[in-house]
C-alpha cells in the first residue's frame, strides 16, 4: 500500500462525500467537485473519514491509491477553505483589472489582453499590479495562473513580466565590452 494512502482523509464540518462505483463527489460551502475512480482502489467512508484500500497488489494500483488520496484531500480542502494563487505584474505601465468574469491586462503590447475565467474561478485585484485567483479546484486555479503568466513571462535581464508572488526571478548580468 502507498505510504500516502495509509492515512485517511478527514472530512471537516460542512463537507459531505458521496461515493459511487465510478466516481466520488465532495460537496462543501465553496462548491461541488467530482473525481472519477479506477477499479484498482476501493474508497470507504466511516466516522467522517475516507479510507483508500488497494483492490489488487499491482504496482499501478499501489501508485493510484496514493494519487487518488492526494486528489481527494485537495478536493476536501478546496470545498472547505479554497485555493488561491497570487500574481504580481512587474514593469512600467503593466496593469490588471477585473471586468465581469474576465481579467483585462495591459502588458506592454499594442492591445489589451483579456483572459476569460472558467466557471468556479474568481479573480480580484487588490492593487493594479496584483492579481489573486481563487477557487475550489486546485488544478484549475493553478492552470489559470499559469495561462495569465504565459502572456508575459518574467524576462531575465530586467525581470519585467507577470510572476507568481512567491517566484524568485534570477537577474542576469548584461554583456560587458
Swiss-Prot record:
What Gene Ontology terms for biological process does this UniProt record contain? cytoplasmic translation
Presence of the UniProt keyword rRNA-binding in the record? yes
Record SUPFAM superfamilies: Ribosomal protein L6
Pfam name, any one: Ribosomal_L6
**What is this protein's function?**
This protein binds to the 23S rRNA, and is important in its secondary structure. It is located near the subunit interface in the base of the L7/L12 stalk, and near the tRNA binding site of the peptidyltransferase center.
Entry-linked NCBIfam families:
L6_bact (TIGR03654)
Record text on subunit structure and interactions:
Part of the 50S ribosomal subunit.
Question: What's the protein here called?
Answer: Large ribosomal subunit protein uL6
Amino acid at each position: 500500500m502507498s505510504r500516502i494512502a495509509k492515512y485517511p482523509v478527514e472530512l471537516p464540518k460542512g463537507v459531505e462525500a458521496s461515493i459511487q462505483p465510478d466516481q466520488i463527489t465532495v460537496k462543501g460551502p465553496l462548491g461541488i467537485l467530482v473525481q472519477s475512480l479506477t477499479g484498482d482502489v476501493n474508497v470507504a467512508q466511516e466516522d467522517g473519514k475516507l479510507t483508500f484500500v488497494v483492490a489488487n497488489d499491482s504496482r499501478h494500483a499501489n501508485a493510484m491509491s496514493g494519487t487518488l488520496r492526494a486528489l481527494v484531500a485537495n478536493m476536501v480542502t478546496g470545498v472547505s477553505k479554497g485555493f488561491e494563487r497570487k500574481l504580481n505584474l512587474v514593469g512600467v505601465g503593466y496593469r490588471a483589472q477585473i471586468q465581469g468574469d474576465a481579467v483585462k491586462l495591459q502588458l506592454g503590447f499594442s492591445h489589451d489582453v483579456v483572459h476569460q475565467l472558467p466557471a468556479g474561478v474568481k479573480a480580484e485585484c487588490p492593487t493594479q499590479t496584483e492579481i489573486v485567483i481563487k477557487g475550489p479546484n486546485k488544478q484549475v486555479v493553478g492552470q489559470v495562473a499559469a495561462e495569465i503568466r504565459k502572456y508575459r513571462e518574467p524576462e531575465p535581464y530586467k525581470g519585467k513580466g507577470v510572476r507568481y508572488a512567491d517566484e524568485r526571478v534570477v537577474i542576469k548580468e548584461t554583456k560587458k565590452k
